[in-house]
């Protein structure tokens, strides 16, 4: 959250930043030389908006998205329970990493059913039940493109899975970090 308390037409020598670890707690008060447009004590440097990747550099893309009502995503315990009940499911389970998981080292998994045959799916009733719930969730979506994907419940609605190992960079991090968290992931990680 950001709240700007006041503006002045004249340049005041007294500038103050208030930061809250807990919005209900007491602020950390910092005297500032200058409060820039990014609301930090730094010179007024404004980064230009850029839609294109600088020439010669690979393009950053958003990762794959299931839009599945959560039914293709598994916690550690759900993964273990599923494999115990249906050992053949192990070949269809992949690590699934979003920004929160990357930053906090939280393990999460997904059912990556790309290429699964109807016979293989029917042989795993618990996986099939999850797929049916994906169909229901997508059918009830207010978004037409998601409803259209109800006919393909085994697939992510947005499949941007790289064919080579890649760098994963969270879309949102924190200005309090000295470094941007980045992970080198294999093609097996969604």
Whereabouts are the PLM-identified features?
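Conserved beta strand-loop-helix elements of the APE1-like EEP
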Residues: 2-14
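Short, solvent-exposed loop/turn segments at the edges of secondary structure
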Residues: 1-2, 106
């Amino acid at each position: 959250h950001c709240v700007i308390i006041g503006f002045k037409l004249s340049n005041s020598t007294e500038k103050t930043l208030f930061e809250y670890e807990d919005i209900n707690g007491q602020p950390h008060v910092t005297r500032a030389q200058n409060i820039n447009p990014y609301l930090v004590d730094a010179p007024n440097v404004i980064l230009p908006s850029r839609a294109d990747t600088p020439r010669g550099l690979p393009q950053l893309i958003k990762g794959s998205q299931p839009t599945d009502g959560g039914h293709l995503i598994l916690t550690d315990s759900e993964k273990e329970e599923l494999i115990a009940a249906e050992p053949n499911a192990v070949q269809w389970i992949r690590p699934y990493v979003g920004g929160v998981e990357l930053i906090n080292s939280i393990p999460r998994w997904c059912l990556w059913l790309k290429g699964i045959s109807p016979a293989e799916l029917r042989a795993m009733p618990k996986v099939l039940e999850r797929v049916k719930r994906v169909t229901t969730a997508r059918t009830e979506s207010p978004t037409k493109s998601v409803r259209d994907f109800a006919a393909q419940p085994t697939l992510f609605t947005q499949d941007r899975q790289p064919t080579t190992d890649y760098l994963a960079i969270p879309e949102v991090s924190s200005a309090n970090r000295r470094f941007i968290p980045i992970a080198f992931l294999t093609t097996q990680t969604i």
